Amino acid sequence: MEIAVFGGGAWGRALAFAFGEKNEVKIISRRDLNEPLKKLNDALISKGSAPIEQVDLQRGLKAVLYVIAISVQHLREWFQNASLPKNAKVLIASKGIEVLNRAFVSEIAKDFIDPNSLCFLAGPSFAAEIIQGLPCALVIHSNNQALALEFANKTPSFIRAYAQQDIIGGEIAGAYKNVIAIAGGVCDGLKLGNSAKASLLSRGLVEMQRFGAFFGGKTETFLGLSGAGDLFLTANSILSRNYRVGLGLAQNKPLEVVLEELGEVAEGVKTTNAIVEIARKYGIYTPIASELALLLKGKSVLESMNDLIRRA
């Protein structure tokens, strides 16, 4: 079956590689991917799979299934330009909250496609490990269980994909864990110790669940792969962009410098502000996200973490 992956960043290429084991994959990106795809295609060909082919948007739209791996902040614009069929089968693999309209991913998508045609990819994984074929378990959330299973059955042998409902819980967990991961990086960067880190992450999980429950997210989603699993991975690894943002802030570097050195998108930065604004609107208690927002605006890192440990 033909699958189109939209987005040529590290995550998009990793997903193209993963789906390429069992399927014919087309990838659509503004950048030239000839060199980045070479090693991935060599690996696919060695397994008897077809190589990933970079094509233009119109060719990509002829695929049967669509996987979207672009920044959440550009997702609405992408949907507007792509003009997908209303019943297009879409798996969104982007984690975050749109800052401009304070909208969740599913809220953006429903303006352009049938909600029953939408899936959301969640769970603990890094692009760098997927392209090595290392094992992981992910969750495909959808209100349409049959569609979630269809996507799950297209994943490679090294990925265990579960099909679950609760799309709102899955996308909130995927967005919120990036926020807590920044705080986790700060905690480690300041060498506050394992006890403080454990307290931060456990309270962060509670905060994530509280926020998600307000919008109908289920407890089991936040305690499973989509929530706890992704949080513990992202908040503890140097492979995580958001964790590295926290490490940089712990060195008293201005946020602008940290992001410039990172050279990649860290969704948690903008997601933090979106969460705080949403929480303020609905009266949801989010002490970690609120304190982190102050840190991102320039509050002293030591003062911020001291306040955070006491409040969280």
Curated annotation (Swiss-Prot):
Q: Where does NADPH bind?
A: 11, 30-31, 95, 127, 241, 265, 267
Where on the tree of life does the source sit, at the highest rank?
Bacteria
Keywords, ordered alphabetically: Cytoplasm, Lipid biosynthesis, Lipid metabolism, NAD, NADP, Nucleotide-binding, Oxidoreductase, Phospholipid biosynthesis, Phospholipid metabolism
What biological-process terms (Gene Ontology) are attached? carbohydrate metabolic process; glycerol-3-phosphate biosynthetic process; glycerol-3-phosphate catabolic process; glycerophospholipid metabolic process; phospholipid biosynthetic process
Q: Which Pfam families match?
A: NAD_Gly3P_dh_C, NAD_Gly3P_dh_N
**What Enzyme Commission number(s) apply to this enzyme?**
1.1.1.94
EC category name: oxidoreductase
Compartments in which it is found: Cytoplasm
Its annotated pathway reads: Membrane lipid metabolism; glycerophospholipid metabolism
- For whether the record's keyword set contains NAD, the answer is yes
Binding positions for sn-glycerol 3-phosphate?
95, 123, 125, 177, 230, 240-242
What one GO molecular function would you report for this record?
A: NAD binding
Q: What is its main location?
A: cytoplasm
Which reactions does this protein catalyse?
A: sn-glycerol 3-phosphate + NAD(+) = dihydroxyacetone phosphate + NADH + H(+); sn-glycerol 3-phosphate + NADP(+) = dihydroxyacetone phosphate + NADPH + H(+)
Annotated catalytic residues: 177 (proton acceptor)
The UniProt entry's GO CC annotations, sorted and at most eight, read: cytosol
- Name the InterPro entries for this protein: 6-PGluconate_DH-like_C_sf, 6PGD_dom2, G3P_DH_NAD-dep, G3P_DH_NAD-dep_C, G3P_DH_NAD-dep_N, NAD(P)-bd_dom_sf
Q: Where are the transmembrane segments?
A: none
Protein's name according to its UniProt entry: Glycerol-3-phosphate dehydrogenase [NAD(P)+]
Q: Which organism is it from?
A: Helicobacter pylori (strain Shi470)
Source species taxonomy: Bacteria, Pseudomonadati, Campylobacterota, Epsilonproteobacteria, Campylobacterales
